[in-house]
Amino acid sequence: MEVAQPKDLKEDFVLAKRRHAELVRQKRIFNARNRIIGGDTTAWDAQVCDQNIKAATEKARDEAFAAEMRQNDKIACLSENRERRDRKNLCKAINDFQQSFQRPETRREFDLSDPLALKKDRPARQSDYDARNTISGMQKFMGEDLNFHLRKKFQEEQNREWSLQQQKEQMIGRENQKCAEDLYLKTRLQFDETAKHLQNLETATRKAVCATVKEFNKNQALESAEKKIQERKQEQEDNLAEISNMLRGDLLSENPQQAASSFGPHRVVPDRWKGMSQEQLEEIRLVQRQQVQEKLRLQEEERQRDMDWDRRRIQKARATLLFEQQQQRLQRGLRRALDCSNLSLAREQLLQKKHMKELCTNHATEDYFTQFNTGSR
């Protein structure tokens, strides 16, 4: 059974990390949409998820609010019904109590001799401007005048007239709005007909232009074809003339005199020169053999010179090695002498420390430290 070492675990972790990075890179490169568009799908998915969560949260909150509102409405309706029922029961109880225990014959001001005395008595006021109707008497309040019913009827009639007038104005406004809408619709239809007519004219004009352009292109194509035929014919004639000139010229006949230059016998015309003669080639080969021999001689001299330098370098390296060995021996001797000297000095220092430890047994006082740094230098 193999035991996993920390080094092996680290290598496995590095390999797994590389494989994961390679897979991520392949997924990023081979995805044409992300590579071309450059969109961050991870961020988009996160945004969509956040939006869905937000929408679900808002929906749940709205549903909770709606349920709470329905519950509150139900409670309010129940409370209102209970309050209305309690008020009705209270009014009924008050009426029952008044009819049972507060009858007119049980009042203090009831006269047994004349039970209708209060009904025969004059009212508190005869009119709205009665002299007995003082401020302190509190017999007249706003809205409690004797002409209240007539005034209320007049106000109702006035409100009815105002309502009829408003209805009439609203009807006139609706008729005016309908007329305006009809006029707008009629104008819109006229505009549509005009636009359709203009579009038809534009279509006809475009067709005429297309036909003209087509005819022009056809003529241009015919002219171009005719021109190409003439150019091809002229090119064939030029090619035949060129072939005839080439066959009769000095280029294919390889006349050596055509390369002679007017600047001297040592100059030639490059575009007419057909090569060197046998004498020139032999002269070049002779010069090449001489150059080869000269190069061999120089190489031999260079080899001898390199051997001489190698021999000198070896001798110098041997002398340097001997000198370094001698210096190392001298350094070892000096090192041994220095070690002996350091050993003796260490022993002396140890003895001195031991002596000072035995001699100086008192601790340093504050006066000892104040004697230092007393000046600027």
Swiss-Prot record:
Expressed in trachea multiciliated cells. Residues 217-250, 282-308 form a coiled coil. Disulfide bonds: none annotated. GO terms for biological process: flagellated sperm motility. Keywords: Cell projection, Cilium, Coiled coil, Cytoplasm, Cytoskeleton, Flagellum. Pfam families: RIB43A (PF05914). It is found in: Cytoplasm, Cytoskeleton, Cilium axoneme; Cytoplasm, Cytoskeleton, Flagellum axoneme. One of its GO terms (cellular component) is axonemal A tubule inner sheath. Microtubule inner protein (MIP) part of the dynein-decorated doublet microtubules (DMTs) in cilia axoneme, which is required for motile cilia beating. Microtubule inner protein component of sperm flagellar doublet microtubules. PANTHER family: RIB43A-LIKE WITH COILED-COILS PROTEIN 2 (PTHR14517:SF10), RIB43A-RELATED (PTHR14517). Belongs to the RIB43A family. This is RIB43A-like with coiled-coils protein 2. It comes from Bos taurus (Bovine).
